[in-house]
Amino acid sequence: HSHFPIAMHAMKLGKAVYVEKPLAHSFVECDLLMKAADKYGVVTQLGNQGHSTVKYHQFKEYVETGVVKDVYKVVAHMNNARRWHKWEGRLAKLPGPERIPATLDWDTWLATVAHHEYSSDYVMGEWRAWYDFGSGCMGDWGAHLIDCVHQFLLKGDLPNEVRVLNTKGWNKFVYPMDSTLA
């Protein structure tokens, strides 16, 4: 949630930026970042360590040589046992306030997000699960799972259609435990 405002501020200062995912919280923020890079004439890079792997370059070669062509459907999944959050759709309200640790500047951590009372459920790896702070499993892993498709098959364009087929553990506060998109 803080990558966008920090990157915007740095570009306004004329600084080149390297930003790890999640880059932004919305397509609008991504568009604003691209426009700011052009406006301020700075170099930008989104970090994705997958671009350093052999399989990334191998897939690129497969597309360029025609081994992979005429793709009409992509199915990507992540079945790693890592938990995304502990609530599994049972969360009825936001967590109650806790004492802010002396080592944390909570207002700075919130960045541009609307005020929330501090809870340890928002920090460390848990921030990824909350709509206000993270981007869920798809935001964390989608960049890795569909990066080659986006880069080499769609050539940087967006897909024509994305359908939600399943959202397990959906809640108005946190992202689903898993989802199926087509």
Region locations from a protein language model:
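A structural signal for well-ordered alpha-helical segments within the folded catalytic domains
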Residues: 4, 8, 31, 53-57, ...
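Short, solvent-exposed loop/turn and secondary-structure capping segments
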Residues: 4-9, 29-30, 56-57, 84-90, ...
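Beta-strand-loop-alpha-helix segment that lines the small-molecule cofactor/substrate pocket
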Residues: 4-52, 64-66
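A generic secondary-structure signal for well-formed alpha-helical elements
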Residues: 15, 34-37, 41, 63-71, ...
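Structural recognition of the beta-strand scaffold that forms the well-ordered cores
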Residues: 18-19, 25, 43-46, 72-76, ...
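Rossmann-like NAD(P)H-binding beta-loop-alpha module
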Residues: 55-109
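Rossmann-like dinucleotide-binding domain that binds NAD(P)(H)
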Residues: 100-103, 107-182
